[in-house]
Regions:
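Short linear sequence motifs
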Residues: 37, 43-46, 65, 96, ...
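Low-complexity, flexible helical/coil segments
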Residues: 17-22, 63-64, 97-109, 125-126
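Catalytic core of nucleotide-sugar-dependent glycosyltransferases
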Residues: 72-76, 81-107
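Generic detector of well-ordered alpha-helical segments enriched in charged/polar residues
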Residues: 12-16, 100, 112, 116
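Non-catalytic, C-terminal membrane-associated alpha-helical segments of glycosyltransferases
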Residues: 84-94, 110-126
Length: 126
């Protein structure tokens, strides 16, 4: 179902766990100045979009509509599939820690975060 909520709420219990917005072409942004996040953004090869969303949602809100309004496909040799598994995992943990250190996170969300880490390790075979 569609929903609207405060960005911080989305960060604390959803984006804490993983990037739930895999298709940046499905996102509509307000006119923003990214100069405040630009340097930190450059540190990420895999999770840059995730970091960007968290930075935006710290100050804004999110509306989610599950209707397929565009299409997203993943190619066999996409960055997501070919990037080093350890680097991928480390950036996910780095983003989770970034969020955990800056926001109030409840115990259930923390448990989901650690469960996702276990799942990701198995998925990436590391």
């Amino acid at each position: 179902a569609p929903y609207f909520r405060k960005g911080v709420d989305e960060i604390q219990d959803t984006l804490l766990i993983k990037n739930t917005i895999p298709n940046v072409s499905s996102v509509v942004f307000k006119n923003i100045d990214i100069k405040t996040t630009e340097k930190q953004l450059e540190k990420f090869k895999i999770a840059g979009d995730w970091f960007f969303y968290v930075s935006l949602l710290t100050e804004g809100d999110i509306y989610f509509n599950p209707a397929p309004l565009n299409y997203h496909r993943r190619h066999l040799n996409s960055v997501t599939r070919t990037e080093d598994s350890y680097s991928h995992y480390n950036e996910v943990v780095q983003m989770q820690n970034f969020i955990k250190e800056r926001f109030t996170i409840d115990g259930i969300s923390k448990m989901k975060m650690y469960t996702y880490r276990k799942y990701l390790k198995a998925y990436l075979k590391i």
